[in-house]
Curated annotation (Swiss-Prot):
This is Enolase. Its cofactor is Mg(2+). The keyword Secreted applies. Its EC number is 4.2.1.11. Mg(2+) binds at residues 246, 289, 316. Keywords: Cytoplasm, Glycolysis, Lyase, Magnesium, Metal-binding, Secreted. GO terms for molecular function: magnesium ion binding; phosphopyruvate hydratase activity. Component of the RNA degradosome, a multiprotein complex involved in RNA processing and mRNA degradation. It catalyses: (2R)-2-phosphoglycerate = phosphoenolpyruvate + H2O.
Length: 429
């Protein structure tokens, strides 16, 4: 049985040019597992703490040398000699060493990087693909599926410097037969969308997640442009391709009002729920993420009651990959899906627990990147290894996004006939 003989942390850059944490876990047989922690822009208030230095003389205060020092010091000392395959023991030990509710002492970025690096080392040690090792850790050995990609092809909100309030407009190739076919469909739509925007005299620069970020008259205008691109690509909207939104509503919620500054409109919770309901009636939108503010549970209940039978309502800032919060949401009938982000909770073990709790309650689980990413493609293996069925990892450009899609293509090839792609069956309604 291999043992951990060294752990190394370092400061690297993410896709926004901000520092993040990378960790190496070295085993006594020479195997090395490496992983990076991602970082978000629109974040939930109850996420685990991303430890940054606050030293304005380095990286505008965003350095992560404190987190790196925690890896190279106390975390390393704690885990030396441990079995890398006992993921739960490693993660629990780090959580106990931290001793805070939100990992504020060691930093969720430090704990997560080591947690994922250990999983990668353990997978290599057992001569397993990472997705297979994750399935074993999840208690579902050999149960895999290829996720439906939710491809963010127009960026707004905190992910772009434009006037569009809703943060993400996504296409889902639900009519594809395989993941690779779905990826091709999304890519073709992406290129046609560029032509549609150019023909309208609009900017085709991209946002943080690789989607186009033009100024548009309204959120409905963005959906209309995508609908035109789908048609020009030769696909049928609502059958071959469906739509999804990430409102990130907490970013435009203030004093009990949802303020769409790009449209000059303001709503109370019921009014905004009706606004979203109207969009789902005019377009084949089958998933809405963070449709209401994370603290507006009454509003979430209104939205769930209005459209929850037909539309996947995903809690991101709402649930922050946290089983305590998710449990409360399930009990109160809030939403019907959870977004899964490693760094919101800070360890692989806790991430798997959130997925398991969601599935047991009949909620869907959507595996997700962050807007600040690296070349690390672990979420691709997580999606397949947990058979989550859905993945959000951005648009069809920027290597920090495409690296995840390319890993999924490799996994699909490895699985061969076992590479199940369920398409529309992964969604509600």
């Amino acid at each position: 049985m291999a043992k951990i003989v060294d752990i190394k942390g370092r400061e690297v850059l993410d896709s926004r040019g901000n520092p993040t944490v990378e960790a190496d876990v070295l085993l006594d047989n020479g195997i090395i597992g490496s992983a990076c922690a991602p970082s978000g822009a629109s974040t939930g208030s109850r996420e685990a703490l991303e430890l940054r230095d606050g030293d304005k003389s380095r990286y505008l205060g965003k350095g992560v040398l404190k987190a790196v020092a925690n890896i190279n010091g106390p975390i390393r000392d704690l885990l030396l000699g441990k079995d890398p395959s006992d993921q739960k023991a490693l993660d629990r030990a780090m959580i106990e060493l931290d001793g805070t509710e939100n990992k504020a002492k060691l930093g969720a970025n430090a704990i997560l990087a080591v947690s994922l690096a250990a999983a990668k080392a353990a997978a290599q040690d057992q001569d397993l693909p990472l997705y297979a090792h994750i399935a074993n850790l999840n208690g579902t050995p050999g149960q895999y599926s290829m996720p439906v990609p939710m491809m963010n092809i127009i960026n707004g909100g905190e992910h772009a410097d434009n006037n569009v309030d809703i943060q993400e407009f996504m296409v889902q190739p639900v009519g594809a037969k395989t993941f690779s076919d779905g990826l091709r469909m999304g890519t073709e739509i992406f290129h046609h969308l560029k032509a549609v925007l150019k023909a309208r005299g609009l900017n085709t620069a991209v946002g943080d997640e690789g989607g186009f970020a033009p100024n548009l008259a309204s959120n409905e205008d963005a959906l209309g442009a995508i609908a035109e691109a789908v048609e020009k690509a030769g696909y049928k909207l609502g059958t071959d391709v469906t739509l999804a939104l990430d409102c990130a509503a907490s970013e435009f919620y203030e004093d009990g009002k949802y303020n769409l500054s790009g449209e000059g409109k303001s709503f109370d919770a019921e009014g905004f729920a009706d606004y979203l309901k109207g969009l789902t009636e005019r377009f084949p939108i089958i998933s809405i993420e963070d449709g209401l503010d994370e603290s507006d549970w009454a509003g979430w209940k209104i939205l769930t009651d209005k459209i929850g039978e037909k539309v996947q309502l995903v809690g991101d800032d709402l649930f922050v990959t946290n089983t305590k919060i998710l449990k409360e949401g399930i009990e109160k009938g809030i939403g019907n899906s959870i977004l899964i982000k490693f760094n919101q909770i800070g360890s692989l073990t806790e991430t798997l627990e959130a997925i398991q709790m969601a599935k047991a309650a009949g909620y869907t689980a959507v595996i997700s990147h962050r807007s600040g990413e690296t070349e690390d493609s672990t979420i691709a293996d997580l999606a397949v290894g947990t058979a989550a069925g859905q993945i959000k990892t951005g648009s069809l450009c920027r290597s920090d996004r495409v690296s995840k899609y390319n890993q999924l293509l490799r996994i699909e090839e490895q699985l061969g006939a076992k590479a199940v792609y369920r398409g529309r069956a992964e969604f509600r309604g």
